[in-house]
Amino acid sequence: MQNVTDSFVSLGHWPSAGGFGFNTDILATNPINLSVVLGVVIYFGKGVLNDLLDNRKQRILSTIRNSEELRQAAIEQLEKARARLRKVETEANDYRVNGYSEIEREKQNLIKATSENLERLENYKNETLLFEQQRAINQVRQRVFQQALQGALGTLNSCLNSELHFRTISANIGILGVMEE
């Protein structure tokens, strides 16, 4: 890997006067710079990105576990409600003569309330999962963008120096001088 890097560095110092070589003009070599920056970001950012994704995965799994615990609690509540329903049904048999319609209404209300509670908990679980997933995606995007920007700035700063600026300005002055004549 070091030899490949050294070969690209040595190619960058070849004279650009009418032969093969790298053009160090940043405006003319944008695809080359972008490919180098992307290569650096991919090479060095892969580990960080994997760590971020692993951490995010653990958080999401933790959220899923919490949601499953909430689901289990809802199931337990449902079982308690069913037990209560069975109790109400036995009482209904005892009081069938006196108030069958009122007991049936209570049964339906109990079933409806339990179903709504279970549905609300399921919606909460789904919303939590979606929120965590979106937050993870946004954090990964932000981290990749920051790393790409830092890599690009580092590459630009390492490639630009005062001698390069002086040569570029001199070349442009020469071109303008030729254009005026």
Swiss-Prot record:
Record membrane topology: Single-pass membrane protein
Segments traversing the membrane: 27-49
Signal peptide: none
Protein's UniProt keywords contain Ion transport: yes
Major location category of this protein: plastid
InterPro entries membership: ATP_synth_b/b'su_bac/chlpt
Highest rank taxon of the organism: Eukaryota
Pfam annotation, one family: ATP-synt_B
MF terms (GO), sorted A to Z: proton-transporting ATP synthase activity, rotational mechanism
Compartments where located: Plastid, Chloroplast thylakoid membrane
Keywords on record: ATP synthesis, CF(0), Chloroplast, Hydrogen ion transport, Ion transport, Membrane, Plastid, Thylakoid, Transmembrane, Transmembrane helix, Transport
Entry GO terms, CC: chloroplast thylakoid membrane; proton-transporting ATP synthase complex
Known function: F(1)F(0) ATP synthase produces ATP from ADP in the presence of a proton or sodium gradient. F-type ATPases consist of two structural domains, F(1) containing the extramembraneous catalytic core and F(0) containing the membrane proton channel, linked together by a central stalk and a peripheral stalk. During catalysis, ATP synthesis in the catalytic domain of F(1) is coupled via a rotary mechanism of the central stalk subunits to proton translocation. Component of the F(0) channel, it forms part of the peripheral stalk, linking F(1) to F(0).
PANTHER family listed in its UniProt record: ATP SYNTHASE SUBUNIT B, CHLOROPLASTIC
Stated family: Belongs to the ATPase B chain family.
Name of the featured protein: ATP synthase subunit b, chloroplastic
Species this chain originates from: Lemna minor (Common duckweed)
